[in-house]
Structure formats: structure tokens, C-alpha cells
Swiss-Prot record:
<dbReference type="InterPro" id="IPR011501">
    <property type="entry name" value="Noc3_N"/>
</dbReference>
<feature type="coiled-coil region">
    <location>
        <begin position="449"/>
        <end position="490"/>
    </location>
</feature>
<feature type="region of interest" description="Disordered">
    <location>
        <begin position="1"/>
        <end position="91"/>
    </location>
</feature>
<dbReference type="Pfam" id="PF07540">
    <property type="entry name" value="NOC3p"/>
</dbReference>
<feature type="compositionally biased region" description="Basic residues">
    <location>
        <begin position="1"/>
        <end position="19"/>
    </location>
</feature>
<dbReference type="GO" id="GO:0003682">
    <property type="term" value="F:chromatin binding"/>
</dbReference>
<feature type="compositionally biased region" description="Basic residues">
    <location>
        <begin position="42"/>
        <end position="53"/>
    </location>
</feature>
<keyword id="KW-0539">Nucleus</keyword>
<dbReference type="InterPro" id="IPR016024">
    <property type="entry name" value="ARM-type_fold"/>
</dbReference>
<comment type="similarity">
    <text>Belongs to the CBF/MAK21 family.</text>
</comment>
<feature type="region of interest" description="Disordered">
    <location>
        <begin position="167"/>
        <end position="197"/>
    </location>
</feature>
<feature type="region of interest" description="Disordered">
    <location>
        <begin position="780"/>
        <end position="800"/>
    </location>
</feature>
<dbReference type="GO" id="GO:0005730">
    <property type="term" value="C:nucleolus"/>
</dbReference>
<feature type="compositionally biased region" description="Polar residues">
    <location>
        <begin position="789"/>
        <end position="800"/>
    </location>
</feature>
<dbReference type="GO" id="GO:0005634">
    <property type="term" value="C:nucleus"/>
</dbReference>
<dbReference type="InterPro" id="IPR011989">
    <property type="entry name" value="ARM-like"/>
</dbReference>
<dbReference type="InterPro" id="IPR016903">
    <property type="entry name" value="Nucleolar_cplx-assoc_3"/>
</dbReference>
Length: 800
């Protein structure tokens, strides 16, 4: 007994023994134990489910009657003898018939049950039917199924004995407290039935009163939450419950107000960090009261924020699917207004809370709405995405947005609006790592390798070193500042996804409406493209130009993209893109002469990249040919485009001073100018003159006249023929924007017509002699004496 007990007795493991057991083994043991407990509980639930199913099947099953057995001749004779032995003289005919009917039905009672012979000689089915019927459980009075709570099992000699108890039922008072709104809604539904009919004025007053009460309630809840979010976090649920307003009079307005109020509340109370779920160890650990209160606040905030986003998403889905709810509080016509408010709230949360939880869910919800058929909804979503991409400094939100857009473009087979891809032009990507792959851009490890640890450290030191490295990693993750390496890595990955979108469209959807947006995007990010793709990309762009399937603007974008590629890293490549110069030279005359011409902006960008920035690769004949063609084009353009073209000509004459030969009036040269030739190198531009400047000198726009006079003098930078500072320091693009006629305005303003006032001549002093004029004025100012006349006296009186 002694040795056996010593063998069975487990020794307490030493500290060295515990060190040998790795954390991985301990975690595996814990997982196995939890798996066994879950499997045993799962088996119990499965058996209970089978039992409940069998009982429910029997309760719904109709019982089959017994088969009628054929009577043997002996039984028939006994029944006849029994009927004859009855005292029929003492019974009425009705009683006799009733007894005979009972006797016919009592064949089961009068049959000889001791006989083993089959009732039907040929059929053995009746035996099986009888056995199945007897085995079928009887219908019993069913009790309500009670939910069981599984407790810890008890261990016995035979094994584990599972324990369970019935879940206590909450009293009815608590249920009434949890759902007080339902009774209020029911009362409100019952009141209109008994209420008398109201006039339209009374209905309007009643609605205004209800709406004012709801507004005050929303304001009170919002103010309480903002005053102390940690204490009043439970009021978020009450405010969110008002999203389900059922009063048809004020339902739409109240829901809109609650949506906007919740959006503003969340923007104010959401912390500046992402809330992660607690682990099991953190939940089991004892913490301070303040920490516990903070955890409750964070859990409540995340849950209510999640429910709020789900409500917004469901509102938009109901509007898109035109789904009617059970409660007719909101009609289908009003769902559009509700959905627009919901989309606006989603857009605001996307821009205001890019760091908080469920931001990726908001992106997934919002990106399909960018391609919505409703113009207002699409514009709201696109503007929100542009704001997010412009203000994203790290690049994490931009990467998530670009990935979702890429998936949508591919899933919809490139049938989306161009405005969706135009949003990608707002990406803030200035620096990427083009030499290494995305995996190589990760920061180098600062920790010791396994071989170094094993060589230099003991086992205990390795344990301590491992714990120290783990702590350092956690501290690095907790830092708020983002490293430059991480930023470059995110930007590189984002740019890879963007180029993947562009190259897919160039390869598979060259006739799509997205081609213009793709070419514009390639022109912006061309300096970040890897050198390996340059030859293939230039070949694709030239094939697109020569195919004839592109519009004028798309062909200009192709030219601009190709020169952006060649002006960046393409400087190391010895390529002369003469075919692109020839195409632009040929298509310059197709610029639209009337209306707001937005193609002029792209033309000015092309001239800047092709002639100014590549001045060393451009020949003098090519520059002179473009100068002559641009002056010809300027004759039939609007003032804003004409000013931009003349500013580009000034830039050409200053970059290539020998172009002043076109200002000479010599009639002889080494050939004849061929304006109809499409190749600028061989059209003999040195044998012509810029006679268009004489016509532009008398243009109705004053700025055009200034530029024409300036160019006729050779575009000097100093002297009498130089331009003013306000014109000479601006680029052609800036001048085009400043003098734009897009808003139907004229810059400088047109002078008004001269005033046509009548000239009145005043009469001054007519006499030169001052004394004479004074006497005349004095005589005119004297009042004449009034004399009384007497007509009764004789008119004449004779003198003696």
C-alpha cells in the first residue's frame, strides 16, 4: 500500500518544470477543456431538441382508426344467438335497433383474443398496424417548455453528471417597465378612434403641439447627454428609440430631427481613440470604480452607435427597395426625404469620425450610393469622400476607401459614373516607395534574432527578453504618432490599388465613359508609376489616340498623360514623342469657338509640359510652328481663352528668343509656309509672319489688346513695351481663370453708356457797364405805387 500510494501521489512541479511548459501548451489545454464542456452541453441540447420534436409531431398527427377485421362464421353465429336471446317483447323498436347497432360495433369486445390465428389469412399488414398504433405515444396535456440553465457538472464514480435548473421567469412588472412605450403607442392608437372629427385648423394646431413636445423632449435628452456623457449614457437608448416614432402626424419630422440630433451628439461625445472589445481576462480582473464606469460608458457608446448606424442603413435600404413597413406611420413618398437625411448623417460621420469604430462599415455603406441614380444622393456621397481623402494624413482611411471602390468597379463590370473615379484625384499621395515591394517597406526589426538570443543568453534571460520585447511592441502600438515608414507603406499600397483600377479599365473597357477619368488620374499620378510600365503604357495611349474612338477631351488627356510620364522618371529614357506633338498640332484648330470652353485648360497644361518643361528636347522649327498655329487659333476664341493662348505665346517667345523672326516682314525665305501640313517640323514656319497680332490689337477686350501690342514688340520684360506686374507674373492658367466668362461676367467690367443730359443756357448780366446794370436792377425791384381811381368825376376838366 505504501509504494503504490507513493507512485500515485503527484509531485509538485518545480519552477524549472513550469518554465519548460510553454504558453502555447497551456492555451491548448485550456481550449481542449472548453471544447469538451461545449460538446457535452451540445449533446444535451440536441437530445432535448429531439424529444421536444417527437412530442410536437405526435400532438399534430391525426390518429388512424383500427382496421375492420373480417368476422369469422363462428362469431357471426354467436352474435345472432345473442340477439335472439334478448327480450324483444319488452323493448321498443327504437331501443332494439340501437342495441343491434351497438352489437355490430362491439366486434372487438366479443372477439376471441386468445386465438393466435391471423384475422386476414392473406395479409400480414394488420399486425404491423396494430403494433405501430400501440407503440405510438398518447397525446398528453403539454406544458410550456421552460428554458434550462446548465450548471457545473458533478463528478461521480460513474463519470460526469450534468446539472441544470429552470431559468427564473421575470415578473410582469419588470416587463412593463422595460417597454413602457408600447402602452403609450397603443393608447395613442385607441384615442383617435373615440375622438371626434377635427377641422383642418384644429388638426394643424394639434400637430404643432405634438411636434413642439417632441422637439422639447429631443432637446432635453441631447442636452443631458452632452452635459455628462458618462452618467447619462443610458439616455442615448431613449433618444434612439424615438427613431421608431409611430404617430403618423409627426413621424417623418420627428425621425429626421432625431437622426440629426444623434449625429451631432455622437460627433461631440465620441473619444479620439478606437474602442476595442475587452478580453476575458480583462473582464474577470478587478478594477477601480472609475475604470469600471469608463468601461460601461465605452460599451454603451459603441453599442448605441452600432444600432444607430443600422437604423440609418435600414432607412436607406427601405427607400431603395420601396419596402412598406407594417406600421403605416411613414408613407413611401416620405421615405425619400428620410433617406436623404440618413445619407447626410452617414456622410457627416464618415468625415468627422474616421478613427472610430465601424468606419469601414460606413465606407462599405456609402460607396455604392456614390453611383446612385438620384443626383442629390450621389453628389452628397462624392463630396464626403473627397473631403475624407483630402484630410486623411495617415492614409489608412484612404486605403480602405480605394479598396471598396475597386471592388465596386470590378463587380459592376465598369458600369459606374465617372464622378466616382474623379474622387480619386483628391488623394494626398506625394511620396511612395517605388524601388521595393510593399512587404519590403515594413520597418526593420529592432529586436534580437533567435540565433543571437540562443548564443548570448541563458534560458531565464531569454524568458525575460521575450517579455520585454512584447512590452515594447505594445508600447509602440499605443503611440499616437504615426511613423513615416508606415505612412509611405500605406500610400504605396493605396497607389497600387488605384493603378490596378486604371489599368483594368485601359485593358478591358477602352470604350467606357470612365476613360476620361482614368486618363486624368494617370496624368496626375504618372510621376509615381514604375519605369517598367512606361513602354507598354505609352503604346496603349498612342493606340487609343490613333483608334479614332476617343473624344477631343479624351485625346488631350492621353497626350497630357504621356508627357507627364516622360517628364518625371521618363527623362532617363531617350524617347522623342513626335507623334504626340503632331496630334496636338493637328487638333489645335478644333477648339470650340463659342460657349464655356473647358478644353482650353487641358491645352494650356499640354503646352506647358510639352514646350516649356522640355525646352531642351524641342527644336526651333517645332516651337515656331506651334507659335504660328496658336496665334491663328486665338482669332476665333472667347476673351478668356484668347488671353490664355496669348500668355502661352509670350512664354514661348521668351523661352525661344529666335522666334522673333516671325515678326519680320521679309517676303523671301527658304520655302513656302504650309499651314495644312500636320507635321510641325516640315511646314516651314520661319517663312511666315504673325499677322494675326494686328487684328488682335484692335480686339474689344482691353487685356487682349495689351497682350497683342506686347507680342508685336517682341515680348520684352522691361521697357515701354513690357506688361504690367499684374499680368506678367501670372501663368496662362491663372489668367484664363481670372478672365473666365463662365458666370456671364466681363472682366474688366464694361463701361456704361454716356449720359445724355440736356444742356441749359443761363442768362447772365447783359450789360457791360456795372453802374447801368445796378440801376436797372434797382428799378425792377421797386414796387409800383397803387393809385385810387375815381370814375364818378368827369373825365375831363376844362381849365379856365
Amino acid at each position: 500500500m505504501g509504494p503504490a500510494s507513493k507512485r500515485n501521489k503527484k509531485k509538485r512541479p518545480s519552477f524549472r518544470k513550469l518554465l519548460k511548459t510553454s504558453n502555447l501548451k497551456l492555451e491548448n489545454k485550456l481550449k481542449n477543456r472548453q471544447f469538451k464542456q461545449q460538446s457535452s452541453a451540445k449533446k444535451q441540447r440536441k437530445e432535448q431538441r429531439k424529444l421536444h420534436k417527437a412530442i410536437s409531431d405526435v400532438s399534430h398527427q391525426t390518429l388512424k382508426p383500427l382496421e375492420r377485421y373480417k368476422k369469422r362464421p363462428e362469431d357471426e353465429e354467436e352474435e345472432e344467438e345473442f340477439l335472439e336471446s334478448l327480450p324483444t317483447d319488452m323493448m321498443d323498436e327504437d331501443d332494439l335497433e340501437h342495441i343491434r347497432a351497438i352489437a355490430q360495433k362491439a366486434s372487438f369486445l366479443t372477439r376471441d383474443l386468445s386465438s393466435c390465428a391471423p384475422v386476414h389469412a392473406k395479409k400480414h399488414k394488420s399486425e404491423q398496424a396494430l403494433e405501430n398504433y400501440e407503440k405510438m405515444p398518447r397525446k398528453m396535456q403539454q406544458e410550456e417548455e421552460k428554458e434550462l440553465i446548465h450548471l457545473l457538472p458533478i463528478k461521480d464514480k460513474s463519470g460526469l453528471i450534468p446539472q441544470s435548473m429552470e431559468k427564473p421567469v421575470l415578473p410582469q412588472a419588470e416587463e412593463e417597465e422595460e417597454e413602457p412605450n408600447q402602452e403609450v403607442y397603443l393608447q395613442k392608437e385607441e384615442e383617435p378612434e373615440s375622438a371626434p372629427l377635427l377641422t383642418p385648423q384644429e388638426q394643424f394646431e394639434q400637430r404643432a403641439q405634438k411636434l413642439m413636445e417632441k422637439k422639447l423632449r429631443i432637446a432635453a435628452l441631447s442636452s443631458a447627454i452632452l452635459a455628462d456623457p458618462h452618467v447619462n449614457i443610458k439616455k442615448l437608448k431613449e433618444l434612439r428609440a424615438m427613431l421608431m416614432e409611430t404617430d403618423p402626424c409627426v413621424a417623418v419630422t420627428v425621425r429626421k430631427l432625431v437622426m440629426v440630433s444623434l449625429m451631432e451628439v455622437f460627433k461631440d461625445i465620441v473619444p479620439a481613440y478606437r474602442i476595442r472589445p475587452l478580453t476575458e481576462e480583462e473582464k474577470a480582473a478587478k478594477v477601480k470604480k472609475e475604470t469600471l464606469q469608463l468601461r460601461e460608458f465605452e460599451e454603451g457608446l459603441v453599442s448605441q452607435y452600432k444600432f444607430y448606424l443600422e437604423e440609418l442603413e435600414q432607412t436607406v435600404k427601405d427607400w431603395k427597395q420601396k419596402k412598406e413597413k407594417r406600421s403605416q406611420a411613414v408613407s413611401l413618398q416620405s421615405y425619400k426625404g428620410l433617406a436623404e437625411v440618413a445619407v447626410r448623417c452617414i456622410c457627416e460621420l464618415l468625415v468627422a469620425l474616421p478613427h472610430f469604430n465601424f468606419h469601414n462599415n460606413i465606407i462599405v455603406m456609402l460607396v455604392p450610393l456614390m453611383n446612385d441614380s438620384d443626383k442629390k444622393v450621389s453628389e452628397m456621397c462624392c463630396e464626403a469622400v473627397k473631403k475624407l481623402l483630402k484630410q486623411d494624413k495617415v492614409g489608412q482611411a484612404s486605403l480602405a476607401m480605394v479598396k471598396v471602390i475597386s471592388g465596386m468597379v470590378k463587380s459592376r463590370n465598369y458600369r459606374i459614373k465617372p464622378v466616382v473615379l474623379n474622387c480619386l484625384l483628391c488623394l494626398r499621395i506625394k511620396e511612395v516607395d517605388m524601388k521595393k515591394d510593399t512587404e519590403d517597406t515594413a520597418p526593420k526589426k529592432k529586436f534580437m534574432s533567435f540565433k543571437e538570443k540562443r548564443k548570448n543568453l541563458s534560458r531565464m534571460q531569454r524568458k525575460w527578453k521575450k517579455a520585454e520585447e512584447k512590452l515594447q511592441k505594445e508600447l509602440l502600438e499605443a503611440e499616437a504618432t504615426e511613423s513615416k515608414e508606415k505612412k509611405i507603406k500605406l500610400h504605396t499600397e493605396t497607389l497600387n490599388v488605384v493603378f490596378l483600377i486604371y489599368f483594368r479599365i485601359l485593358k478591358k473597357a477602352q470604350k467606357s465613359v470612365l476613360l476620361s477619368s482614368v486618363l486624368e488620374g494617370l496624368a496626375k499620378f504618372a510621376h509615381l508609376i514604375n519605369l517598367e510600365f512606361f513602354d507598354d503604357l505609352l503604346a496603349v495611349l498612342y493606340n487609343l489616340i490613333t483608334s479614332g474612338d476617343l473624344t477631343y477631351r479624351e485625346s488631350l488627356h492621353c497626350i497630357l498623360t504621356s508627357f507627364h510620364i516622360l517628364s518625371g522618371q521618363g527623362d532617363v529614357l531617350n524617347i522623342d514623342p513626335l507623334k504626340f506633338y503632331s496630334h496636338l498640332y493637328r487638333t489645335l484648330l478644333t477648339l470650340h469657338a463659342g460657349g464655356v470652353n473647358e478644353d482650353t485648360v487641358i491645352v494650356l497644361q499640354c503646352l506647358d509640359v510639352m514646350l516649356s518643361k522640355r525646352r531642351k528636347q524641342v527644336t526651333l522649327q517645332r516651337a515656331q510652328a506651334f507659335l504660328k498655329r496658336l496665334n491663328t487659333v486665338a482669332l476665333h476664341l472667347l476673351p478668356d481663352s484668347c488671353v490664355g493662348i496669348l500668355a502661352a505665346n509670350r512664354m514661348l517667345m521668351q523661352t525661344f528668343p529666335k522666334c522673333d523672326i516671325l515678326l519680320d516682314n521679309e517676303t523671301q525665305g527658304s520655302g513656302v509656309y504650309l499651314p495644312e501640313l500636320d507635321v510641325p517640323e516640315y511646314c516651314n514656319p520661319q517663312n511666315t509672319a504673325l499677322w494675326e497680332l494686328h487684328l488682335l490689337k484692335s480686339h474689344y477686350h482691353p487685356v487682349v489688346r495689351k497682350f497683342a501690342a506686347h507680342l508685336m514688340k517682341g515680348a520684352p520684360s522691361e521697357g515701354s513695351g513690357a506688361l504690367g506686374v499684374e499680368l506678367s507674373r501670372r501663368s496662362p492658367l491663372q489668367l484664363f481663370e481670372d478672365y473666365s466668362v463662365k458666370d456671364m461676367s466681363f472682366n474688366p467690367p464694361v463701361a456704361g453708356p454716356p449720359s445724355k443730359k440736356k444742356e441749359y443756357f443761363t442768362i447772365g448780366h447783359a450789360f457791360l457797364h456795372s453802374e447801368l446794370s445796378r440801376q436797372i436792377d434797382a428799378a425792377l425791384q421797386e414796387e409800383p405805387e397803387q393809385m385810387s381811381l375815381d370814375f364818378t368825376s368827369p373825365h375831363t376838366q376844362q381849365e379856365p
